[in-house]
Curated annotation (Swiss-Prot):
EC class: isomerase
NCBIfam families, per the entry: tig
Protein name: Trigger factor
InterPro entries associated with the record: PPIase_dom_sf, PPIase_FKBP_dom, Trig_fac, Trigger_fac_C, Trigger_fac_C_sf, Trigger_fac_ribosome-bd_bac, Trigger_fac_ribosome-bd_sf, Trigger_fact/SurA_dom_sf
Gene Ontology biological process: 'de novo' cotranslational protein folding; cell division; chaperone-mediated protein folding; protein transport; protein unfolding
Family from the record: Belongs to the FKBP-type PPIase family. Tig subfamily.
The record's note on its domains: Consists of 3 domains; the N-terminus binds the ribosome, the middle domain has PPIase activity, while the C-terminus has intrinsic chaperone activity on its own.
Length: 432
């Protein structure tokens, strides 16, 4: 076998291989012997068919199969010998084949980039230092009460957190526009559902009032014909309701799994959940900064085959989220996912090099801790832990999470890490 390797462009490679004619003939004869042992031909017992008849009937197809097998096996041998690491599926380009002559073919593919990590010492990471305070717990309790609130009609003017029912008609330059008209529209104020200025224009008005408000659509508004346009909305306010928050009764508290129904028990449970969320948020904030610094410090080429593969993964995930099927997933424009796919491939290659150079392996103690932490959010943590322990795929996924954490820690060990006092609310809003 003769082998030559050339660089086509960037990460592209072409391996040209020549297989000696005698190697091909030896393999063909060997395979014909195997075929002769199995075939049945009228007039001959199984395994007793003369080789010339076997060759006459099956020679062409056997030769084709043998060539395909030799091409594949010789390519694998060649890349092992040349220490080449292909990325993605190779493209075989067969040359002209004549019986009794050497056979030359080429294989085109991309290789993984040679990554040499640099600039780790210049990465800057700001670690949030956060404590869950009693005031934070109070805010969360109010949020829980608001989620369980009922609505009661009121006579006064609409306030920032009221719920209103209204009719409205929007116009731009005196003309109505699509989506700008509604009847008996229910709007919970203070959630930012409407364009800026709309809710402010409703506040202070009472039931039965008809009025007009002036607003301007944001420049980044989704409808092209409305971006940055001034608009008027004629409004008829038909109902104003205010929240009635439930009291922290024993019955209310037990809804959240606090068996003794006490306020102290609820506060303790809420604090525990907040601290678990906080731990994850701090971890994610530090991780995102470390990865961003790693990517900026290391500009690497990326095999297009890996990007294509990642795009397919993202397409399928998007289709699943919206109830689509495989066919619909593949029809989604690749442009929607290309940037994210490339980013994920780059991050994967860089973290892979961190893992390789630091000879990291998943710490089973960490894996166990991650599973226990995740399971603590469920009603029966022991059941969740047992379910994970019996599922190889889930365990492998968690080992990958642990290994990624260890890689991030290896980056942080060389990076410039500082601390910054932050409130719980500020950090969680950054995560949103």
């Amino acid at each position: 076998m003769q082998v030559s390797v050339e660089t086509t462009q960037g990460l592209g490679r072409r391996v040209t291989i020549t297989i000696a004619a005698d190697s091909i003939e030896t393999a063909v004869k060997s395979e014909l012997v195997n075929v002769a042992k199995k075939v049945r031909i009228d007039g001959f017992r199984k395994g007793k068919v003369p080789m010339n008849i076997v060759a006459q009937r099956y020679g062409a197809s056997v030769r084709q199969d043998v060539l395909g097998d030799l091409m594949s096996r010789n390519f694998v041998d060649a890349i092992i010998k040349e220490k080449i690491n292909p990325a993605g599926a190779p493209n075989y380009v067969p040359g002209e084949y004549k019986v009794g002559e050497d056979f030359t073919y080429s294989v085109e593919f991309e290789v993984y980039p040679e990554v040499e990590l640099t600039g780790l010492e210049s990465i800057e990471v700001e670690k949030p230092v956060v404590e869950v305070t009693d005031a934070d717990v109070d805010v969360m309790l109010d949020t829980l009460r608001k989620q369980q609130a009922t609505w009661k009609e009121k006579d006064g003017a609409a306030d920032a957190e009221d719920r209103v029912t209204l009719d409205f008609t929007g116009t731009v330059d005196g003309e109505e526009f699509e989506g700008g008209k509604a009847t008996d529209f229910v709007l919970a104020m203070g959630q930012g559902r409407m364009i800026p200025g709309f809710e402010d224009g409703v506040k202070g008005h009472k039931v039965g009032e008809e009025f007009t408000i002036d607003v301007t659509f944001p420049e980044e508004y989704h409808a092209e014909n409305l971006k940055g346009k001034a608009a008027k909305f004629a409004i008829n306010l038909k109902k104003v309701e205010e929240r009635e928050l439930p009291e922290l009764t024993e019955e209310f508290i037990k809804r959240f799994g606090v068996e003794d129904g006490s306020v102290a028990g609820l506060r303790a449970e809420v604090r525990k959940n907040m601290e678990r969320e906080l731990k994850g948020a701090v971890r994610n904030r530090v991780k995102s900064q470390a990865i961003e610094g790693l990517v900026k410090a290391n500009d690497i080429d990326v095999p297009s085959a890996l990007i294509d593969s990642e795009i397919d993964v993202l397409r399928r995930q998007a289709a699943q989220r919206f109830g689509g099927n495989e066919k619909q997933a593949l029809e989604l424009p690749r442009e929607l996912f290309e940037e994210q796919a490339k980013r994920r491939v780059v991050v994967g290659l860089l973290l892979g090099e961190v893992i390789r150079t630091n000879e990291l392996k998943a710490d089973e103690v960490r894996v166990k801790g991650l599973i226990e932490e995740m399971a603590s959010a469920y009603e029966d943590p022991k059941e969740v832990i047992e379910f994970y322990s019996k599922n190889k795929e889930l365990m492998d996924n968690m080992r990958n999470v642990a290994l990624e954490e260890q890689a991030i820690e290896a980056v942080l060990a060389k990076a410039k890490v500082s601390e910054k006092a932050t409130s719980f609310n500020e950090l969680m809003n950054q995560q949103a």
